[in-house]
């Protein structure tokens, strides 16, 4: 899960309620927006761009369109998550991608993502990593 840890300006992230596609969501899960319905949904593939929303509760949506609590992903915050797999060679400044499901980060096989590492506990799967969106 992606947890907001620290802000540049000391402000608290405001919550919004956005309509969601049917499904089960977890607090700290990054979400995309369905281009057809405009509702938030789980990320279904690895993502090298910045997702727009972060879910703020464990919730199951039975009926599409039910609002769920989210915050907008902010470039002014540092977030903490875990590595989905070993990220050999990752150092401060490495840009990671969001794994499918929106709960962890990984080092892309080619290119770079938009989650820039600011601190690492290690580079093994499951190690904590902190970063900001660039």
Spans of model-derived segments:
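Surface-exposed, low-hydrophobicity beta-strand/loop segments enriched in small/polar/acidic residues
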Residues: 1-134
């Amino acid at each position: 899960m992606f947890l907001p840890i620290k802000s540049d300006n000391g402000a608290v992230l405001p919550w919004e309620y956005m309509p969601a596609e049917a499904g089960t969501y977890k607090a700290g899960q990054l979400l995309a927006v369905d281009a057809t319905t405009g509702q938030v949904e789980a990320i279904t593939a690895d993502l090298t761009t910045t997702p727009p929303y972060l879910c703020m509760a464990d919730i199951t949506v039975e009926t599409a369109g039910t609002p769920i609590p989210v915050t907008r992903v902010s470039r002014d915050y540092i977030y903490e998550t875990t590595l989905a797999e070993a990220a050999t060679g990752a150092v401060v400044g490495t840009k990671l991608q969001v794994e499918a499901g929106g709960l962890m980060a990984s080092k892309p096989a080619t290119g770079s993502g938009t989650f820039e590492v600011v601190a690492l506990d290690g580079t093994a799967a499951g190690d904590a990593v902190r970063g900001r969106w660039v």
